[in-house]
């Protein structure tokens, strides 16, 4: 499961992700990708499930890049505990995602394989996504 090796503080305030993604909103490594269309927290387990779905469908061909990392700690109090008495214990980590953020990129496979692999990955995520292709990618003359 994805999580930071070390954090400065064990707990963090919830905060609110507002607006669209200002960085990480364009394809940087691959020719294909999935872009978030809504704001949500994505856990490390969800990212890992999406990664496994992509690699299984692509049969270890090509290359993928995970563009988000869960570095925000989430706390939870046990069941049947009254309000107060401090913040709960750290439970896991999430990656806050805003609209426009590229989540996964792929390269080295055909357009059809990449589209289906990233569709399977998008089903594992709790947000609506959009399949994006690099502007200078030529679908007619693909050599994958």
Swiss-Prot record:
InterPro entries: Ribosomal_uL16 (IPR047873), Ribosomal_uL16_bact-type (IPR000114), Ribosomal_uL16_CS (IPR020798), Ribosomal_uL16_dom (IPR016180), Ribosomal_uL16_sf (IPR036920). SUPFAM superfamilies: Ribosomal protein L16p/L10e (SSF54686). Residues 1-17 have a biased composition (Basic residues). One of its GO terms (molecular function) is tRNA binding. Keywords: Ribonucleoprotein, Ribosomal protein, RNA-binding, rRNA-binding, tRNA-binding. NCBIfam families: rplP_bact. Binds 23S rRNA and is also seen to make contacts with the A and possibly P site tRNAs. Part of the 50S ribosomal subunit. This is Large ribosomal subunit protein uL16. It comes from Bacteroides thetaiotaomicron (strain ATCC 29148 / DSM 2079 / JCM 5827 / CCUG 10774 / NCTC 10582 / VPI-5482 / E50). The gene is rplP.
């Amino acid at each position: 499961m994805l999580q930071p090796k070390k954090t400065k503080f064990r707990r963090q305030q919830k905060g609110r992700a507002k607006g669209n993604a200002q960085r990480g909103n364009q394809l940087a490594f691959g020719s294909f990708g999935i872009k978030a269309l809504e704001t949500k927290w994505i856990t490390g387990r969800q990212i890992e499930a999406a990664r496994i779905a992509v690699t299984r469908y692509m049969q270890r061909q090509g290359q993928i890049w995970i563009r988000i990392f869960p570095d925000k700690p989430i706390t939870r109090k046990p069941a049947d505990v009254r309000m107060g008495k401090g913040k709960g214990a750290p439970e896991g980590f999430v990656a806050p995602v805003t609209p426009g953020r590229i989540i996964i990129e792929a390269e080295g496979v055909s357009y059809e394989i990449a589209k289906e692999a990233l569709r399977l990955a998008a089903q594992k995520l709790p947000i609506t996504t959009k399949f994006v292709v690099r502007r200078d990618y030529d679908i007619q003359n693909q050599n994958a």
